[in-house]
Amino acid sequence: MMPSTTLSTVLSDINEFVVKQGHGVKGLSELGLQTLPNQYVHPPEERLSSMDVVSDDSIPVIDVSNWEDPKVAKLICNAAEKRGFFQIVNHGIPLEMLEKAKAATYRFFREPAQEKKKYSKENCPTSHVRYSTSFLPQIEKALEWKDHLSMFYVSDQEAAQYWPPSCRDDALEYLKSCELVSRKLLEALMQGLNVNQIDDSKESLLMGSRRININYYPKCPNPDLTVGVGRHSDISTLTLLLQDDIGGLYVRKLEHEAWSHVPPVKGALVINIGDALQIMSNGRYKSIEHRVMANESNDRISVPVFVNPKPNDIVGPLPEVLASGEKPVYKPVLYSDYAKHFYRKAHNGKDTIAFARIE
C-alpha cells in the first residue's frame, strides 16, 4: 500500500496521475484504495442494482459449426431482431488464439506507466492508436472505472510501426482471424434483409474498416458506486467481443428497463448489432444498450473487435429493405459524421441513434 501522504497527493490530482502520467485506473487501483475517489462516483440512476437484473434470462448461444445450415442463419437473424446480442460457439477461431489475445491484453497493461503513456493522445504520433482511461475523461461528470487501448487497422505496415510491441502481433493475428467470422455473420444477416450477395460496395459499407480494443477493468473498492462502462450502444456494424471468465457485461432487455447478464462461455464470442446495422436494416436489427459493472474481487479484461463502414461511406436503410415499400425510419448519414457525434459526448444510452432518425 502506498504511504498515506503520497496517496493523498495522488487523490488531490487524479487527472495528473491517471491520465497525464499514464498510470490509468489500474495504477489507481494498485495504490490500495479503501474507498472510491469522488471522481468515479456515479449518480444512483446510472448504477445497476440487483433489482434491475433479470436472473433467469440469458442471450442466445448459437452453434455456428455449420455456417451453410439455413437454421444457423435463421437463428442469427432472429437473435439480431429480438435481442441484438447473442453468443457464438464453434466459430473456427482456435481457443489457443483467443487465449493469446487475452494474454496480450495483460502484457500491455502490465507495462510501466511511462511506456503506456507513449500511446496517449498527447504523445502518440498517429491518431489510429490510443491509450486512454474512461470514455471521454475530459468531459464526463463521473469517470468510468476502465483503461483501454484502441487500435484502428489501416495496414500491416502501419501496425508494425505504431502498435505497441507488447501486444501487436497477437492482437493483429486475432483481428485478422475475426474477419472470416464477421463475413459469415454478415452473410447470414443480409439474408434476412433480402440481400443475396455482399458485393464490393456492400463489403465496404458493412465491413470496410476494423478496430480492435483491449480493455482492462481493475478491481474496485466500491463497485456499487461506479461503472466499468456506462450505458451505450456501439456505432459499429457488428461488434465481436472476447471476454474472460469474470463476467460483468449487462445487456438491456428490448423495450424493458431490466438488464440481463451475459455469462462467460468458454471459447465463445459475444456478438452485438451496432447502430450502423440498425440503420441499414431500417430498425429490423436492434443495436441494444449495454454496460459493464465494476467488481471488487477480480481484475477483468475484454477484447472487442469493431467491424464498421468506412468513414466516407453513406449509411442509410438498404435499398433491398425498402424495396417492398417500407417507409424509411432513418436518413442517410456520412458515417464519419455519425462517429464524430458519438465521440463528442459522454455515454448516455442510445442517444446517438437520434442523429440519423427521421423526425
Curated annotation (Swiss-Prot):
Tissue: Mostly expressed in underground stems and stems, and, at low levels, in tubers, leaves and petioles.
Biological process, per Gene Ontology: coumarin biosynthetic process; phenylpropanoid biosynthetic process; response to fungus; response to molecule of fungal origin
Pathway: Phenylpropanoid metabolism
Gene Ontology MF terms in the entry: 2-oxoglutarate-dependent dioxygenase activity; 4-coumaroyl 2'-hydroxylase activity; metal ion binding
Record domain Fe2OG dioxygenase: where: 201-309
Cofactor note: Binds 1 Fe(2+) ion per subunit.
Inducing factors: Transiently induced by fungal (F.oxysporum f.sp. batatas O-17) and chitosan treatments, in association with the accumulation of umbelliferone and its glucoside (skimmin) in the tubers.
pH dependence (record): Optimum pH is 7.2.
Chain sites annotated for binding Fe cation: H232, D234, H290
Keyword Iron (UniProt): yes
EC identifiers of the protein: 1.14.11.61, 1.14.11.62
Keywords: Dioxygenase, Iron, Metal-binding, Oxidoreductase
Function: 2-oxoglutarate (OG)- and Fe(II)-dependent dioxygenase (2OGD) involved in scopoletin and umbelliferone biosynthesis. Converts feruloyl CoA into 6'-hydroxyferuloyl CoA, and p-coumaroyl CoA into 2,4-dihydroxycinnamoyl-CoA, but has no activity with caffeoyl-CoA.
Name of protein: Bi-functional coumaroyl CoA and feruloyl CoA ortho-hydroxylase F6H2-1-8
Gene from which this protein is expressed: F6H2-1-8
